[in-house]
Amino acid sequence: MVKRSKKYREAAERVDRNNLYTANEAIALLKSMPAYNFDQTVEAVFRLSVDPRKADQLVRGTVNLPHGTGKTAKVLVFARGPKATEATEAGADIVGDDDLIAKVQGGFLDFDAVVATPDMMGKVGRLGRVLGPRGLMPNPKTGTVTMDVTKAVKDIKGGKIEFRVDKNGNLSFLIGKMSFDESALDENFKAVADEVKRLKPATVKGRYLTKATITSTMNPGVPVDPNTLA
C-alpha cells in the first residue's frame, strides 16, 4: 500500500467522495489544498465510453487553450531549405532534416511537439516506433504535417495541445499551473471539455463522457459532474 504524505492526506480529506463538483468548485477546492514549494501542473482527465480499437471511435485532435499551459513547449521541426529557415524564424527550438531524423532514431527525445513538412514524411515515417507511443508523430489531421510551419510552430508555442484517447478510453490534458487564477483554469478546462464533446463519434450511443476529474501534481483528483459539462 502506498504511504501518502501528511499534506496529501489533508488534501484528500477535503474532497467529498460522495459528491460530484462543478468545474469551478473543483478548481477552487484544488487551489485551497496545502501548498508546495513549486508551481504544480493542473490536469484534466476524462473517461469516454469509446472503444479505441475501432478506427471510428479513436478520439483525437487539438485544442487551443485560451490561457496556455503555463509551459512553453519545445518544438522540433523536420524541414529543409526555406521551410527550415521559416521554422527557425517562427521560434522552433530544433530544426533539421536527415541528420535530425537519425538523431531522434538514436534516442534523442528532448522536445514536446513535432512538426514536419509533407516532403519529409517519407523519412519521418520511420520514426513511428519512437514518436508514435509518445503521441509525437506528426499528423495532417492535427496540423503538424504542413507547409505552413510558421503557423504550426506559433500555434504550439501559443498553447495549442494535441490529444489522443488511450487504450482504456481516457484523455488527459494539461490545463495550466496552480499559479493561474481560477477563471483562467476554468476557461482552459471548458475549452478542452467543449472540444472533446464536439468530437463525439457518431457510432457512440448513450452517455459519451462518463467521468471527469481535475487534479494537480501532488494532490488527489477532484471529481467533476459530467452532467455539468453538457
Swiss-Prot record:
Q: Which GO terms describe its cellular component?
A: large ribosomal subunit
Disulfide bond residue pairs:
none
InterPro entries to which the protein is assigned, alphabetical: Ribosom_uL1_bac-type (IPR005878), Ribosomal_uL1 (IPR002143), Ribosomal_uL1-like (IPR023674), Ribosomal_uL1/biogenesis (IPR028364), Ribosomal_uL1_3-a/b-sand (IPR016095), Ribosomal_uL1_CS (IPR023673)
Q: Family, per the entry?
A: Belongs to the universal ribosomal protein uL1 family.
- Report the PANTHER family cross-referenced here: 54S RIBOSOMAL PROTEIN L1, MITOCHONDRIAL, LARGE RIBOSOMAL SUBUNIT PROTEIN UL1M
One biological-process term from Gene Ontology? regulation of translation
Q: Which UniProt keywords apply?
A: Repressor, Ribonucleoprotein, Ribosomal protein, RNA-binding, rRNA-binding, Translation regulation, tRNA-binding
* Oligomer and partners: Part of the 50S ribosomal subunit.
Keyword RNA-binding listed? The answer is yes
Q: Which Pfam families match?
A: Ribosomal_L1
Entry annotated with the keyword S-adenosyl-L-methionine:
no
Gene behind this protein: rplA
Q: Could you state a single Gene Ontology molecular function term?
A: tRNA binding
Described function: Binds directly to 23S rRNA. The L1 stalk is quite mobile in the ribosome, and is involved in E site tRNA release.
Could you identify this protein by its name?
Large ribosomal subunit protein uL1
